[in-house]
Amino acid sequence: MQVTLEKKEGIHCSLLIEVPANEIDSVVSKEINRTAKTIKMDGFRPGKVPAGMVKKKYGEQIRMEVISDLIPQKYSKAIQDEKLAVAGIEVELKENKEGQPLKFVANLELFPEFEVTGFEKIEVQKPVVELTDKEVKQMIENLRKQFATFSEVYKVVEKDDKVTIDFVGKKDGEAFEGGTANDIDVIIGSGQMIPGFEDGIIGMKKGEQKTITVTFPQDYQNKDLAGAETTFDITVKKIQQAELPEVNDEFVKKFGVKGGVDTFENEIKENMQRELKFILQRKVKDQVFKGLREIAKFETPKSLIKREIDAAKQNLLKQMGGAKGFDVNQLPDNLFEANAKQKVETSLILDSIMNSQEFKAEEAEVESLLDELVQAYEEPEKTKEQIKKNDKEIANLKALVIENKLTDWVLEQAKVTEKTEDFFEVIKENMQAQQAGF
């Protein structure tokens, strides 16, 4: 086998590979003889079909099957010999004739080689959130609202009321697509509508019609409406007032709590503290990763981005429960590209740093992280034992321990400031971020 390495611009190169004719023809001949012993053909007993007839009828197909198996073996050997770190590969067949050498080109995209420096340029704003009894009471109030019952009332609309409305949205005096609806239930203050919409209904009565002016958020998904000033003609058809359940033993049983109200409040606070800790860690980590992407200079392999896009599509399909009849591959790649590029770049940067630093996940650290994570489950000890039996889950935990250590290492060198934030705003931002990332 002859191999010629041709270096190209950036992270690209090609391998021109030539396989001797006798090697290819020998394998093809053996496969034809093997096929002749098993194939059924009219006029011949099983195993007695002449190899010449098999070659005449199936020779081209057999040759292509042999080549399809042989090409990956040959370029894998060449890649190994040349000591190349390959991110992606495309094969181009050049010559394929009986009695002639097989020639093909393996166009390679390599993993970039780079060193990350300038950690002191990274700026991180560390959120500081105080969790007091006030936030705990508000959380319990939110849980009460989830179990609220509603009854019709004849008064003006107030916060927390459920109203049934018709509305017509207009931009520049013309109704816009998706801006008209009838018999829609809206809980005032829930934030289910765009900012300003629910506030505009407060004070209205049943049967009243009113036109309000609202401005769509700048980051609204419909670019035609993003940042646009619009009007909504609203008609109130029904007003219902919420009745919240009392916080008693019967109420707390809905959440699987057996120790009464005091136990319930303690568990709520512990859950809030646990959730807050992980969210704040993620917020800091996201800023660190963003900073790393800004200081690291390298070419991102397109093949890795494409692979990540395909994985994101499959993940979306899984979230949709397999959605019969829905071809996720019909979705445009650019819908996923930005997130995919970020993930690939972050992964490459972390790998680069870990290759130069010795971060290890000690068994005690993995155990401690696992103990913390399983507290969110109904049966922590049972969940813990199940996870410990899953090698993939343990590997993920080890990776998370190392990722946390790496983040702390970067933070020691970065410019870190603190910013006081509200608990519920932090939770809301986290939910929005998760939705944006599918």
Curated annotation (Swiss-Prot):
It comes from the Bacteria. Keywords: Cell cycle, Cell division, Chaperone, Cytoplasm, Isomerase, Rotamase. One of its GO terms (cellular component) is cytoplasm. It is found in: Cytoplasm. Its EC number is 5.2.1.8. GO terms for molecular function: peptidyl-prolyl cis-trans isomerase activity; protein folding chaperone; ribosome binding. Residues 160-245 form the PPIase FKBP-type domain. It catalyses: [protein]-peptidylproline (omega=180) = [protein]-peptidylproline (omega=0). Pfam families: FKBP_C, Trigger_C, Trigger_N. One of its GO terms (biological process) is protein transport. The keyword Iron-sulfur does not apply. Transmembrane segments: none annotated. The keyword Isomerase applies. Belongs to the FKBP-type PPIase family. Tig subfamily. Involved in protein export. Acts as a chaperone by maintaining the newly synthesized protein in an open conformation. Functions as a peptidyl-prolyl cis-trans isomerase. Consists of 3 domains; the N-terminus binds the ribosome, the middle domain has PPIase activity, while the C-terminus has intrinsic chaperone activity on its own. NCBIfam families: tig (TIGR00115). This is Trigger factor. It comes from Francisella tularensis subsp. holarctica (strain FTNF002-00 / FTA).
